[in-house]
Amino acid sequence: MFRRLGQDFQLRKVKKILKQINALKGKMSSLSDQELVAKTVEFRQRLSEGESLDDILVEAFAVVREADKRILGMFPYDVQVMGAIVMHYGNVAEMNTGEGKTLTATMPVYLNAFSGEGVMVVTPNEYLSKRDAEEMGQVYRFLGLTIGVPFTEDPKKEMKAEEKKLIYASDIIYTTNSNLGFDYLNDNLASNEEGKFLRPFNYVIIDEIDDILLDSAQTPLIIAGSPRVQSNYYAIIDTLVTTLVEGEDYIFKEEKEEVWLTTKGAKSAENFLGIDNLYKEEHASFARHLVYAIRAHKLFTKDKDYIIRGNEMVLVDKGTGRLMEMTKLQGGLHQAIEAKEHVKLSPETRAMASITYQSLFKMFNKISGMTGTGKVAEKEFIETYNMSVVRIPTNRPRQRIDYPDNLYITLPEKVYASLEYIKQYHAKGNPLLVFVGSVEMSQLYSSLLFREGIAHNVLNANNAAREAQIISESGQMGAVTVATSMAGRGTDIKLGKGVAELGGLIVIGTERMESQRIDLQIRGRSGRQGDPGMSKFFVSLEDDVIKKFGPSWVHKKYKDYQVQDMTQPEVLKGRKYRKLVEKAQHASDSAGRSARRQTLEYAESMNIQRDIVYKERNRLIDGSRDLEDVVVDIIERYTEEVAADHYASRELLFHFIVTNISFHVKEVPDYIDVTDKTAVRSFMKQVIDKELSEKKELLNQHDLYEQFLRLSLLKAIDDNWVEQVDYLQQLSMAIGGQSASQKNPIVEYYQEAYAGFEAMKEQIHADMVRNLLMGLVEVTPKGEIVTHFP
């Protein structure tokens, strides 16, 4: 409805619908509870008679608005209704912090639940999902809808498939992005219909949609499978990397996060390792480890990208500052960072299944979402998801004052100036929320505040468990909170008594972040619902975003500069410096968009392959195919292919048969002419028919033959798909590390990925036959099948 329309025109269309909804206020308030609830049945009936969701939007929104008032004591404001309209039409509603996004969602959720195909509300964490489901669930249940939350009370307890099936059959499901992703992957690993629990994806509302679809877009969800043989190269390669010289032995493009070896670097590596050619096939593992080790040293910084906890390395989410406890970098990069830090190496595992959030949410018929910072990324939302971003007016005029940045040459000057600013406002009693870019900087500010005798809280990846409590206290008079960018999205900061009179909450940013959206989120922590407040950023030429994306003269300026008097830090003024910061952040945002676009391009090949594999699995599971017919087709094709191979002797044919078709063949009869493919095929089919007949006779007594066929075929698909997923991840890493080559990496990746997929299909058919014929089966006294596949 709003695709590519201007903001004013979008709002005019929304306000036209709002006017119709407001006209029904009196009518809805006059209905009894029973009459209001009966509207749900009426709406479903109208849909079944041919009306569309759009046809009943006005009346449905008026109904749930009235229900919100009766059950929750909150009547959605006009601006909340406007946000709800935007989301129903599959777009992003940009609503400021404190504008009531949770209540806004009740309207499109209620309306879209009538389809009977399910509505999902996705939040960034389990706490928010449970909280919102409990609060808003009162409204939905009052109106006759069912609601499900796919979490157990005990995190260690695994929910059974039948339990999840009931939950996902609800009209409305509240979940998290990661939980939904892993449920999708696990659903497609089921070996029978009873193990599946998801229905097709219909409509989703994503809370903090930019965080999930943009900031987390490049982190794939992975279900780890069998461990690899652990490489012992990590330590020696890490030592090698410390001897290499940047610019001579390898090239590092920081803004693109690319590294590659030079000819000199390859020679240095060969001398160190005592090999003749690093790029020979037998030395490919050395080359791969070397690229990972350089990336580990140049692209990953301790206490910013990861922390060390005891003898363990844990990744940190750049966008939120939260620990990514269950996430491991793939392909050996994780172990390369561990080797760099000299901590225990975690086991290398193959990925059984993998998907990105981009790919996951594109499966929904309709996506919508809400955030406080979507407009600056509207172009990317349109290009990637075909969603417009509509900025919803605030219910009350914003009173927060956003002051211009203070820019300094060096980091120490900036830290000193920001500390003086903190002391100034702390003395007045204002609560202060100080945002930093890393765990390391949070520790620095904490030690400085401690030295000044200022009591404070620290919120970083090391103590995220206290996030809600710390954030809830940060609006009280005199409170000082030092936080990484994680601080409490989804949790309002309410001002304590007397704080508004002092000017409200003061937000201080101690550096510009890599994305303008994160800076806007930081500012947005202050000034909720018309509260007073202010924000200000302190920036230096040594900050990461400027070092990484600023012009070359910047580096020389802060290197040559000598601080004369730390207590009199020099503020850089003028358009040149103001533009410098803006351009650096713009370049950073652009690099982020490019990286996400590249991730999407790489993922497209995986998506196509995954879709084919999962559809084939489902056809074997759901009973839509006669499995005996499938087996006949597979064996016909297989015997035709393998019989066409040239067998130079009876011994070679015998060896092939006993390793691929049957253990029970003692010899190849003399009358078989091994050079006659028709005779060879006929003999193979005799052996195959005998093997299958014996299994069928045994298993049919217990009605288990079809189950055996299904398990044999699925095992072949799953084993090979695990190898293919792992191969595609290795391939993307390898091609991504060859940036110096003249080839288009995406084209090269697609070609190699397609060739790998074709080879996988051939191997699947061969393994299906081996499983069917050489799998050992037995039936337990309880009538259950036990299989041992080759």
Swiss-Prot record:
Residues binding ATP: 80, 98-102, 492
Pfam families from the UniProt entry: P-loop_SecA, SecA_DEAD, SecA_PP_bind, SecA_SW
Gene Ontology cellular component annotations, sorted alphabetically: cell envelope Sec protein transport complex; cytosol; plasma membrane
UniProt GO molecular function: ATP binding; protein-exporting ATPase activity
Membrane topology: Peripheral membrane protein
Enzyme Commission identifier(s): 7.4.2.8
Subcellular location: Cell membrane; Cytoplasm
Knockout consequences: A single gene deletion has about 60% decreased biofilm formation, 75% decreased adherence to human lung pneumocytes. Has higher pneumolysin (ply) i.e. hemolytic activity in the cytoplasm but less in the cell wall. Decreased levels of a number of cell wall and secreted proteins. Deletion of 15 genes (from psrP, SP_1772 to SP_1756, includes the accessory Sec export proteins SecA2 and SecY2) and infection of female BALB/cJ mice, shows the psrP-secY2A2 region is required for lung infection and for infection to progress to blood. Mice infected intraperitoneally showed wild-type infection.
GO BP annotations listed: intracellular protein transmembrane transport; protein import; protein targeting; protein transport by the Sec complex
Matches recorded under InterPro entries: Helicase_ATP-bd, Helicase_C-like, P-loop_NTPase, SecA, SecA2, SecA_DEAD, SecA_motor_DEAD, SecA_preprotein_X-link_dom
Homology family: Belongs to the SecA family.
Assembly, per entry: Monomer and homodimer. Part of the essential Sec protein translocation apparatus which comprises SecA, SecYEG and auxiliary proteins SecDF. Other proteins may also be involved.
Name of the protein in its database record: Protein translocase subunit SecA 2
Gene name tied to this protein: secA2
